[in-house]
């Protein structure tokens, strides 16, 4: 969430940002309204408490002057006013922050402003499209040809958008995970495997409000949700902590299974394993100082691109328009890889700078040890590999005329030397 000082000192900056998101500004107006009520109430409360203290100190003199009952009566009235005002102030603060949670991050100046994703800006492309002397198939047909997944049986067991990974595709999945983790470890990241569950309080601090209905699975009769991404558990890793400035940046990579309802994508990509309810992902997460977060965002994207360059997958980097950014994001780049069988680019990676917005919710700060001047730091995150989607992309780019799939060179060591997945 945004710093409350920003609403007081630079409200126009927030109004402008919300307009760039093509939203009504009512939430900003309500924050300012209830913050004014809270501040006014707090001032009145402090005045009443000061008056009560003065009255309490005057009891002895009032007794000498013979007006003790009058002073006691005034003191009781002030105490009653305090008791009446305190819950009102708490309610003003609660309502203020409820609206504050609904206001998105300040849009970065480099974000293209538009209300349609058709205006996403292509920053650069990398790699050559594969050349085929046959009509390339899409990933749905290809995974069936190599008998790499069983979605029909899985739908009977668990419902739609679930799957059994089979045979060489299972090992390809594991190869991608190991490859990505090793690449990131070599770049100085700390590898982790995070919990698959998150408490509701922590989910509220690390997630979008809209995710609870559209994305997150709730565990019945438990104060737990299944994570949609390791970003959530990585963001909470240093919750309510102060990190020494000398230790920044902190770079983590984490393997997790991710669980998503995909309620907002009904009817999209219902076949194959591209858009599913359960998938593996290696996530990157960085804690940085405000001064270095833009540079860290560039490095984060560079490291991510290196993974797909080594996999030999052609891609484009796209700056996402303002209206499509989630609340946490100040700026986001997507890596969209080329799917020749489908004839289109498709998103494999989102790389986001949340600046201080996310860290403020989870109360993660930085400062010199013992200095007492801790400040909110910046957080950044990016997909390294969402393996099921990347498998789909590999299938289309590395397909052979007979339906077999060549294995990217960098993955062969993780596949026990296997170089090709044969069609069945």
From Swiss-Prot:
Consists of two distinct domains, a catalytic core and a N-terminal extension that is involved in tRNA binding. It comes from Methanosphaera stadtmanae (strain ATCC 43021 / DSM 3091 / JCM 11832 / MCB-3). The keyword rRNA-binding does not apply. Keywords: Aminoacyl-tRNA synthetase, ATP-binding, Cytoplasm, Ligase, Nucleotide-binding, Protein biosynthesis. Its EC number is 6.1.1.11. Catalyzes the attachment of serine to tRNA(Ser). Is also able to aminoacylate tRNA(Sec) with serine, to form the misacylated tRNA L-seryl-tRNA(Sec), which will be further converted into selenocysteinyl-tRNA(Sec). It is an enzyme of class 6 (ligase). InterPro entries: aa-tRNA-synt_IIb, aa-tRNA-synth_II, aa-tRNA-synth_II/BPL/LPL, Ser-tRNA-ligase_type_1, Ser-tRNA-synth_1_N, SerRS_1_N_sf, SerRS_core, tRNA-bd_arm. PROSITE patterns: AA_TRNA_LIGASE_II (PS50862). Belongs to the class-II aminoacyl-tRNA synthetase family. Type-1 seryl-tRNA synthetase subfamily. This is Serine--tRNA ligase. The keyword Flavoprotein does not apply.
